[in-house]
């Protein structure tokens, strides 16, 4: 189960980073 949680965590981090880049790109 731990590997599943870590995998989901990585997906969430990637999604948040992509959103942050998109938002920052739009703002700039």
Swiss-Prot record:
It comes from the Bacteria. Signal peptide: none annotated. InterPro entries: Leu_leader. Keywords: Amino-acid biosynthesis, Branched-chain amino acid biosynthesis, Leader peptide, Leucine biosynthesis. It holds the Pfam family Leu_leader. One of its GO terms (biological process) is L-leucine biosynthetic process. Involved in control of the biosynthesis of leucine. This is leu operon leader peptide. It comes from Escherichia coli O157:H7.
């Amino acid at each position: 189960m731990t590997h599943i949680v870590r995998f989901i965590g990585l997906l969430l981090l990637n999604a948040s980073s992509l959103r942050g880049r998109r938002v920052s790109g739009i703002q700039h």
